[in-house]
Amino acid sequence: MSDTTLNVSLASQGYPEPAELFANLGTAPLVEHAVRNGEGLLCVDGPLVVETGKHTGRSAKDKFIVRDAETENTVWWGKTNVAMSPEHFAALKADFIKALGEKDRLYVADLFGGSQPEHRVKVRVINELAWHNLFIRTLLVRPTTDELASFVPEYTIIDLPSFRADPARHGSRSETVIAVNFTEKLILIGGTAYAGEMKKSVFGILNYLLPVKGVMPMHCSANVGPDGKTAVFFGLSGTGKTTLSADASRTLIGDDEHGWSDTAVFNFEGGCYAKMIRLSAEAEPEIFATTKRFGTVLENVVIDPVTRTIDLDDNSLAENSRGSYPIDFIPNASEENLGPVPANLIFLTADAYGVLPPIARLTPDQAMYHFLSGYTARVAGTEIGVTEPEATFSTCFGAPFMPRHPSVYGNLLKERIAKGGVKCWLVNTGWSGGKATQEGIKRMPIKATRALLNAALDGSLNSATFTKDPNFGFEVPVEVPGVDTKLLDPRGAWADGEEYDKTAQELVRKFVDNFQQFADHVDQSVRDAAPVAA
């Protein structure tokens, strides 16, 4: 049985077809299937609420790329991009096909990765779970009926949470596996129900393909101001990419993954994937409103099985609870999913050391340095006695998703900054006045962050007086209307200036040590943009 006809059948791809094949279903039927299959519950306000089991985040250590003639010299092999042999992949593929043949029911979605037609990739996703199919249909770009009629997939993703990998037979690390084969244009995901693996797999495809075409792929959010100028926000998880780009006064291009071509910044996706934990209507009204919409999928959000009400503050299932929803659920979302090339780049960091200023102006060389560094810091689990902040460097603000050498992306970025005269800013959404682990130290007020951002984006900050930071070398504004002056001086915000100096130098050394891996791949001017160790 099939609800809709595929232009290219599964059989023609060499995959078995189940008794029930549901292709390119819409939101309502997929929600019905998910509920009927026992995959989730409908919330009182409309969203579908699901649990992902033991995997509530990405399984970064279980991801592999097949090492062959195509990838041998094009992939940056190491801790992030781990090799799988073609032989192991062949065994894995054979077992995936066998597992597909044992399914009574499958869901297929033909979708685009990328909103700019000349730079998008055609992706087919095959799922055993209806809610997974709904998720990826929400997150990627949905073809029109006419486009589906002639759709020929370039890449295929098969996602089977029930599959269990065998490390001895498949070369995996555990029963969970995400295996990417750029030669066969096939991605196999097994042993995890975390839906984000699918979206990040498509991101990885585009991050591999687009630099060859001179297009800069970015792990970022992006929006456009009333003046028609685009801002791009880079940042690791938890730094505020989604929150700060969902601004009612600006048009949202997207919240997570974009390309920068000669003519546009374009969203890779057609949906958003936002953190839900402790979400509030006051702090994030646009995102909060999506938790009351039919079509939203809430992952690992606690729901009362009787009243069907949800508790966004309850982290008993996961700290990384998520919500996926179509981008048009956000007011002022761009209808085309794209905008002009950027006027401003924002590097977001949540500095748990409390030494970075709330905003700093960067030169193009400093921008490339901080892009390649990809710094943020988190507070490690204090429940096990760890009381110091933990520095995290994820190159390009998205190391797990960048198959090529970071310098490929860094040089592309530097070229585009120079070509467009783009203004670059570092924004600290983390802590001020001390380390995050110290009692009474609070995060930067979001109102202050927004005020500083607005001043940067509307151009008024350019006329401010700046002072050079002695540790990091970038320029920090002395005064900004509507922002407490004490906040702008990170050293002055500390009760003990000497303790600040010591902590700042501690962070400087971490930057310097981390950047050694890139030193031979960048110009001297970028090396000179490094923070200064005393």
UniProtKB/Swiss-Prot annotation:
Q: In which pathway does it act?
A: Carbohydrate biosynthesis; gluconeogenesis
**Cross-referenced HAMAP family:** PEPCK_ATP
Concerning SUPFAM superfamilies, the annotation shows: PEP carboxykinase N-terminal domain, PEP carboxykinase-like
Q: Which GO terms describe its biological process?
A: gluconeogenesis
Q: Which keywords does this Swiss-Prot/TrEMBL entry list?
A: ATP-binding, Cytoplasm, Decarboxylase, Gluconeogenesis, Lyase, Manganese, Metal-binding, Nucleotide-binding
Top EC class per UniProt?
A: lyase
Q: What is this protein called?
A: Phosphoenolpyruvate carboxykinase (ATP)
The similarity annotation says: Belongs to the phosphoenolpyruvate carboxykinase (ATP) family.
Bound cofactor: record note: Binds 1 Mn(2+) ion per subunit.
Instruction: Give the EC number(s) listed in the UniProt record.
Output: 4.1.1.49
The free-text function statement in the UniProt record for this protein reads: Involved in the gluconeogenesis. Catalyzes the conversion of oxaloacetate (OAA) to phosphoenolpyruvate (PEP) through direct phosphoryl transfer between the nucleoside triphosphate and OAA.
Binding, Mn(2+): 200, 219, 256
Q: Name one Pfam family in it.
A: PEPCK_ATP
Name the gene behind this protein. Answer: pckA
Organism, as annotated:
Novosphingobium aromaticivorans (strain ATCC 700278 / DSM 12444 / CCUG 56034 / CIP 105152 / NBRC 16084 / F199)
Q: What is its main location?
A: cytoplasm
UniProt catalytic activity: oxaloacetate + ATP = phosphoenolpyruvate + ADP + CO2
A single Gene Ontology CC term: cytosol
Question: For binding ATP, which residues are annotated in this chain's numbering?
Answer: 200, 219, 235-243, 284, 322, 449
> For this protein, what is any one GO molecular function term?
phosphoenolpyruvate carboxykinase (ATP) activity
Cell location: Cytoplasm
Task: Name the residues that bind substrate.
Answer: 58, 194, 200, 322
**Listed cofactors:** Mn(2+)
